[in-house]
Amino acid sequence: MSLAPPLRYLAGYPAHLVAQVSDCLADGSLGERLRRKYPLPHAVRNDGALYAYVGELKARHLRNAAPLSKVVWDGKLQRVHNALGIHARVARVQGGQLRARREIRIANLFREAPPEFLRMIVVHELAHLKEAEHDKAFYQLCCRMEPDYHQLEFDVRTWLCLVEATGAALWAPSTP
């Protein structure tokens, strides 16, 4: 089954769910439904706050995982890598030694998202510290860190369909 471009984010979901999202997108009610379910954006606005937020989640759920050297918002992420967040191991030469550093980059798209959506993408990237592949163990770890992970992932994918179809910024800060 080939999906319309805005619905490509829902490719692995059952047809009845995709049809519901498509209908809501067509009648213009999808944005309002998401805004009703997730009324407010999060308060994490800069790289320092994002680093602290990710560090707190990591300390709570993954104490023994390797430390993160960098956590930043990335404006090019979705266009360049076709990803919403990435976790990278970067090799740096320090003196005569090679040091591996771990970084997490979150797409700027999530700056104006609800806290639940930010938590979902951060949990996803943190899970990659322990599990490299998107397999059963990976998703079990995601669900251990965020029990509502699967619903949040679906809602994020639904939001991405809306953004791609309309360009709507549901939680953009209001200007005075």
Where are the regions that the model predicts?
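Active-site-proximal or metal-binding-adjacent scaffold patches in catalytic folds
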Residues: 1-119, 129-176
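Walker B catalytic acidic pair
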Residues: 125
